[in-house]
Swiss-Prot record:
Keywords associated with the record: Activator, Developmental protein, Nucleus, Transcription, Transcription regulation
Similarity section: Belongs to the Mediator complex subunit 27 family.
Record-level GO BP terms: camera-type eye development; regulation of transcription by RNA polymerase II; retinal cone cell development
GO cellular component: mediator complex
Pfam family, one: Med27
Role according to the record: Component of the Mediator complex, a coactivator involved in the regulated transcription of nearly all RNA polymerase II-dependent genes. Mediator functions as a bridge to convey information from gene-specific regulatory proteins to the basal RNA polymerase II transcription machinery. Mediator is recruited to promoters by direct interactions with regulatory proteins and serves as a scaffold for the assembly of a functional preinitiation complex with RNA polymerase II and the general transcription factors. Required for the development of dopaminergic amacrine cells in the retina.
PANTHER family on file: 34 KDA TRANSCRIPTIONAL CO-ACTIVATOR-RELATED (PTHR13130), MEDIATOR OF RNA POLYMERASE II TRANSCRIPTION SUBUNIT 27 (PTHR13130:SF4)
Organism: Danio rerio (Zebrafish)
Main location: nucleus
Gene label: med27
Protein name: Mediator of RNA polymerase II transcription subunit 27
Quaternary data: Component of the Mediator complex.
Superkingdom per UniProt: Eukaryota
Annotated localization: Nucleus
Length: 311
């Protein structure tokens, strides 16, 4: 009896309730069996109906009695105590539903983040190795003379060499017109016309690309005094995004020891916009998303993506 009080359940009433459930099921089964058999053969139809109704009422009353008995016993059973220790079985209700657990999406996001981190770490490692920033502490301690500061030679390349590099790049891409201007002396400004899609103004310092402005093919690229406008943005959001992506590409294509390779790689990437409005997104397969074409081009594969689909 002490166990019964500790648990909070009347085990005797619980046993009687189980017997009452069995009795209720039996009485309900008798009702359906009686209905299945139908009226028994009697002398007259009237006598058969009276006997059928009488027996049917008796069966229903039996079901009602068993149901009332079960309800009475259910009030005597009681409820389990809330403070009763369930040990590890009490943690079963805390398990999440498998269908509602976003495990796959979280793992996929973590994989993308890890892949992107590894990619950028590789780029950073290659750039640091190119800069030759490693110095030995012993060399710095034993050397009494300071090393002479090395002046970057690539910033003062001959203009003829720069012109030859730009000319070779122009011959590589017949569908891309490159015009070279020198409005401020030695610094070059390139006017790149890509088919009938866009025009890009590339401001350079020797063979280093300083900035890029992309505008539509029919947009004005000159100021009032007929000079190239290297500051104003495009009036169209699509070309504004291409300008932003071009700035990102300048940060990606960095190779100080071979600036001609950087310019050629950037021009190859820029030429991939020749079908800006004709190439669908490689992720969603749509030509337009929120009214914009896929303005992003992958730096390695040159595949087209919408700005939101590339994430």
């Amino acid at each position: 009896m002490a166990d019964v009080m500790n648990v909070g359940v009347n085990l005797e009433a619980f046993s009687q309730a189980i017997n009452a459930i069995q009795a209720l099921r039996s009485s309900v089964t008798r009702v359906f069996d009686f209905l299945k058999d139908g009226m028994k053969n009697k002398e007259t139809l009237e006598s058969r109906e009276k006997v059928f109704i009488t027996e049917f009422q008796e069966n229903l009353q039996s079901v009602n009695r068993d149901l009332n008995e079960l309800e009475r016993l259910s009030t005597l059973v009681g409820r389990p105590s809330e403070s009763h220790p369930l040990h590890n079985s009490g943690l079963l209700s805390l398990d999440p539903v498998q269908d509602k657990t976003p495990l796959y999406s979280q793992l996929l996001q973590a994989y993308k983040w890890s892949n992107k981190l590894q990619y950028h770490a590789g780029l950073a490692s290659s750039l640091l190795n190119q800069q030759s920033l490693k110095r030995s502490a012993n060399q710095m301690g034993t050397s009494a003379k300071r090393r002479p500061k090395v002046q970057p030679s690539t910033l003062a390349l001959p203009t003829q060499y720069v012109d030859d590099v730009i000319s070779r790049i122009g011959r590589m891409f017949p569908d891309m017109s490159i015009e070279l201007f020198r409005p401020n002396g030695t610094s070059a400004v390139l006017l790149v016309t890509l088919g009938k899609v866009l025009k890009a103004i590339v401001v350079m310092r020797s063979l280093f690309i300083d900035r890029t402005i992309v505008r539509g093919f029919h947009e004005n690229i000159y100021t009032e005094d007929r000079k190239l406008d290297i500051w104003s943005k495009s009036n169209y959001q699509a070309f504004q995004k291409v300008t932003d992506h071009a700035t990102t590409a300048l940060l990606h294509y960095q190779l100080p020891q071979m600036p001609d390779v950087v310019v050629r790689s950037f021009m190859t990437w820029l030429r991939s916009y020749i079908k800006l409005f004709q190439t669908p997104c490689q992720r969603c397969g749509k030509y337009l998303q929120e009214g914009l074409p896929p303005t992003w081009r992958d730096f390695r594969t040159l595949e087209a993506f919408h700005d939101t689909c590339r994430q």
